[in-house]
């Protein structure tokens, strides 16, 4: 069995399609497109995204991670205000959401949940079932997606791009 535990930018020699919930796991046994068995071993909290590549520990293969199509809810807002309201209410519930642009407002995809579907429908969005790869936003702090030796906790290199900083834990002292 191949051991996949190193991120790489090399050309892929194989692939595996994984649903969002599988891509969030740090330990996973998979069957590659070629039929070979492989084990994915990542640092706890590290998530995979469609397009990521993992190298085998022995250097014999590079596997591209594909976002597998899955059943989702698609909410379409016909104005920027409605889009913002729907995104706010889903985010307030910590729902993983994929954001897609449309000509007038925006489209939100999230995992199937009839209560959330009714909520965004009640706000005024048109709601439908969809089957598509799910690539939700990683969140305000990056969601554990790291490359190579980068570290989100390195205070001298706090993140990608300007104005990124490491979240601070405030210590409150008793009075």
Curated annotation (Swiss-Prot):
The keyword ATP-binding does not apply. Belongs to the UreE family. GO terms for cellular component: cytoplasm. The keyword Iron does not apply. One of its GO terms (molecular function) is unfolded protein binding. GO terms for biological process: protein folding; protein-containing complex assembly; urea metabolic process. It comes from Dechloromonas aromatica (strain RCB). The gene is ureE. It comes from the Bacteria. Residues 134-175 are annotated as: Disordered. The lineage of its organism: Bacteria, Pseudomonadati, Pseudomonadota, Betaproteobacteria, Rhodocyclales. Keywords: Chaperone, Cytoplasm, Nickel, Nickel insertion. This is Urease accessory protein UreE. Involved in urease metallocenter assembly. Binds nickel. Probably functions as a nickel donor during metallocenter assembly.
């Amino acid at each position: 069995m191949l051991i996949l535990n190193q991120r790489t930018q090399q050309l892929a020699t194989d692939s595996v399609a994984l649903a969002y919930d599988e891509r969030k796991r740090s330990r996973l046994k998979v069957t590659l497109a070629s039929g070979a068995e492989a084990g994915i071993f990542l640092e706890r909290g590290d998530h995979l995204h469609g397009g990521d590549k993992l190298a085998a520990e022995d250097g014999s293969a590079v596997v591209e991670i594909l976002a597998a199509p899955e059943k989702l809810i698609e909410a379409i807002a016909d104005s920027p205000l409605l889009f913002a309201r729907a995104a706010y209410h889903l985010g307030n519930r910590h729902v993983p959401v994929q954001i897609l642009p449309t000509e007038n407002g925006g489209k939100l995809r999230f995992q199937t949940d009839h209560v959330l579907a009714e909520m965004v429908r009640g706000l005024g969005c048109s709601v439908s079932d969809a089957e598509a790869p799910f690539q939700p936003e990683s969140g305000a702090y990056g969601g554990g997606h790291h490359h190579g030796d980068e570290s989100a906790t390195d205070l001298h290199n706090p993140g990608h791009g300007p104005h990124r900083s490491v979240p601070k834990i405030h210590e409150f002292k008793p009075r």
